Amino acid sequence: MKQTYTIGVDFGTQSARAVLCRVSDGAVLSESECPYAHGVMSDRLPCGTPLPPDYALQHPQDFLDALHATVHGVLAKADINRADIIGMGMDFTCSTPLPVDKAGTPLCFDPRFERNPHAYIKLWKHHAAQWEAARLTELMREHDPELLPCVGGRLSPEAFFPKVWQVLREAPDVFDAADRFLEVGDWLTQRLTGNENLARSLATHKAQYREGVGYPPLLRYADPRLAGMIGAKVRGKLIDIGAVSGYLTQQRAAWLGLPAGIVVTAPHPDAMASLPALGITGPGPAALAAGTSSAMILCYSQFLPVEGTTSIMLDNTLPGLYGYASGQAAFGDLLGWFVSRCAPEEVLRAAQDAHISAHEELSRRAARLRPGESGLICLDWWNGNRSCLADMRLSGMLLGMTLQTRPEEIYRALMEGLGFGLRCIIDAHERAGVPIHALHVSGGISYKNPLFMQLLSNIIQRPLYISKPLPTPAVGMTILSACAAGTQKGGYDQLDEAAARMSCLSDIRYQPDASQAAAYDALYQEYIALHDYFGRGANDVMKRLRDLSAAVKEQAYAKHE
């Protein structure tokens, strides 16, 4: 039987990762990764222009370079006939809007705008559009209350239109010069195919597109120019999940070293792309993408409002189902912050002497502790709260430290805090009538930190099923591109069959330890007390401190302008 192959590319926060898979059984024949040269720009632009607080930008050239490098990387490592490659697909963090000119060229490539932050990609964790998000939420309550539960009661600054409105308010010259505002996933797909198609999943997930309604009509109450974007600066045919967005042009095929005319499937949000790779093609378990941040995704046959979800929309995850998206704005980043900023020299030396990472050394020590032994508890809001409060002006807190507190106690408290945050999200779904019986987990931390996974299972009191150590979203895109190609080209016509053959769950399982349930129930109640006190308005000290910090930084920023 002739073998066929597909390529998936996962564009994450810091790097892009590609896989080349055999369609018949999902075997990953090669992998490649390319970090972004400019990384996440939160302090200054490449030209030296300083950035205001809460900015998180990316450079579009990094995406082009990473796509070229990773595709050539997987081709070089795989001993296959390139003519047997039948399709490719890409997933992206979102919302990551980018203003482009009539030729589809990013405005930051134009010398007129290279010093303007608003001409660059706004990364998902760009939280500087908080005012715009809050104002759009107010307008939603007044003019479109049916949309409120679709965004968990409050629109996030991570969504598409708050970021675009920020461009309009703060850089009208960039807004006027833009022919279109595109999700970077749509932009890159259009460059490969030469058309102006858009991904339905990106439009529904972060731009609140609804079938029969379109993009939010309330935009006209925010600013007539914002509403005027629809059909003009936001335009294109919406392509369904796992469908053909276009075909690889001759020029781009030569650039990538691929056959011209192969299928390019619609781009997809990164967390959603993991579901078919984790064997999820319908209602049932939830997928947890455990990366720098976390995203918990599940599908259900009906719409049930859940507090703090970032998106409950039809067709944002799997065709014909409502996708429920929520998560934590810091996850692996939180543990990484502690290691890079706070771990003492003796921990780093011990890790070096044992030839292990600092994370492994801290986990080894933390594993000896019992629940509650450290006397610590934390609110895991180092990057704001995505769910259930949807408030990016909240900040992290560690309570209970003494002069005897040890590094491993803090490290474990951070892991437990992330577990409590996840349990809070799960409880919100359960209260709404959306059951979650198990989590299928992907992301590097899921197989690099067994202690963390066991703690999560103990705290949420549910089993965890772990993916293989692969870039799971990229594998998911190989599955979706195989479906887009169809059986006539050596792919699949049904997603169920494709996922059954190509998914990448491992044999690793974590079952909750019932002996720790009572201790974690008690600690969780303390977490909820702090969560509600600091997060629901009883004490806004976190926001006052952020405002004070922002004011001081704005003064410094103004001096550089």
Model regions and ranges:
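Conserved phosphate-binding catalytic cores of ATP/NTP-utilizing and phosphoryl-transfer enzymes
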Residues: 1-2, 249-258, 268-285
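Glycine/Thr-rich phosphate-binding loops that ligate phosphate moieties of nucleotide
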Residues: 1-42, 86-134, 173, 195, ...
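Gly/Ser/Thr-rich active-site cleft segment
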Residues: 11-13, 137, 143-269, 379-383, ...
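N-terminal phosphate-binding loop and adjacent alpha-helix
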Residues: 33-81, 123
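A polyampholytic, Gly/Pro-enriched intrinsically disordered region
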Residues: 51-57, 130-154, 284-287, 483-500
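Short, hydrophobic/amphipathic alpha-helical packing segments
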Residues: 64-72, 161-164, 269-273, 331, ...
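Phosphate/pyrophosphate-binding loops at sites that engage ATP/ADP/AMP, CoA/4′-phosphopantetheine
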Residues: 67-86, 171-174, 218-231, 254-256, ...
